[in-house]
């Protein structure tokens, strides 16, 4: 999900061209309307999978404490869902990152298959064998417009 700002060849949802955005400057002040925008942006993109949110655990906890409106007793995130979409947790994205979309549009390509090699020499003194597995893969986004990311400004 995360690209590498130092190497433009390594992109993720956060740096990919064409990914749509919703501006939420301060998550603690987010509104229900802010989160309805995520689905509105991908709704016309002919998605085939089930859209989901991905965010940090702290962000999900914050949204569990923000009321949808005054008086209903309902919250933006209830039962780890926002507007019927699952909220998944990823500890490797940025603290402020929120992604939404059809993750079946993230493709993984592999070359040459899985290569497994046995090294009988490295641990020979202890009677063990080292198993080495290599897989060459790359990731691509089929349709960036099926994703939305939160931006702060």
Residue ranges and their predicted role:
Residues 1-42, 149-153:
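Alpha-helical scaffold segments that mediate packing/assembly in large oligomeric complexes
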Residues 25-31, 53, 75, 121:
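Hydrophobic alpha-helical scaffolding
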Residues 1-18, 43-54, 58, 87, ...:
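Long, contiguous amphipathic alpha-helices that act as assembly "spine/axial" helices in icosahedral shell
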Residues 32-35, 52, 59-61:
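Domain-core detector
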Residues 67-153:
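Sequence/fold signature of self-assembling virion shell proteins
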Residues 56-70:
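Active-site pocket-lining segment
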Residues 40-47, 77-80:
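Short, conserved, surface-exposed binding loops centered on an aromatic residue
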């Amino acid at each position: 999900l995360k690209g590498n700002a130092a190497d433009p060849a390594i992109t993720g949802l956060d740096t990919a061209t064409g990914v749509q955005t919703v501006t939420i400057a301060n998550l603690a002040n987010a509104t229900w309307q802010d989160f309805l925008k995520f689905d509105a942006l991908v709704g016309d993109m002919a998605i085939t999978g089930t859209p989901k949110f991905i965010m940090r655990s702290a962000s999900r906890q914050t949204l569990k404490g923000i009321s949808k409106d005054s008086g209903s007793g309902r919250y933006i995130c209830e039962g780890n869902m926002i507007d019927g979409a699952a909220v998944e947790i990823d500890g490797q994205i940025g603290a402020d990152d929120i992604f939404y979309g059809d993750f079946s549009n993230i493709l993984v390509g592999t070359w040459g298959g899985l290569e497994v090699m046995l090294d009988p020499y490295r641990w020979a003194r202890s009677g063990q064998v080292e198993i080495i597995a290599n897989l060459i893969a790359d990731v691509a986004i089929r349709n960036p417009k099926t994703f939305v990311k939160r931006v702060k400004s």
